[in-house]
Amino acid sequence: MPSASHDQIELQEIAPGYSSRFTDWGGITVAFEKAHAGQDASAMVRGLPDDRCQAPHWGFLFSGKIVVHFDDHTETIEGGQAYYIAPGHAIEFLEDSEALEFTPTAALEQTFAAIRRNSAAANSSDV
């Protein structure tokens, strides 16, 4: 049975200001995530269908405040809440946030690929 504490999973930076400790357990990614206040992930998921993350996420927000934007509505998650985020969303961090999240790995890899592409493009235009 896989198990791990926060410090046993390698820290990886997905994009500037967005770091995560994540590992795959049988097709599900387990991630301890941190994001800074003011970060709007909308630009990071451009290029995905509808320019939104298509991965579902289940998790627990330890601290912070997150706004989840869908095409037809917006939802808010606050520290101390468990959550489910359906596919087709973009996330904005209103406060420094820390979460434990579970996501199907294949869907998450598509999202990470878009984030890395968009981050690289943004960094090359800054030069």
Model-predicted segments: where are they?
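A short, N-terminal "cap"/entry segment at the start of jelly-roll beta-barrel domains
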Residues: M1-S42, L48-D50, R116, N123-V127
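Short acidic-glycine-tyrosine-enriched beta hairpin
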Residues: F70-H89
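Ligand-binding loop in jelly-roll beta-barrel domains
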Residues: P87-F112
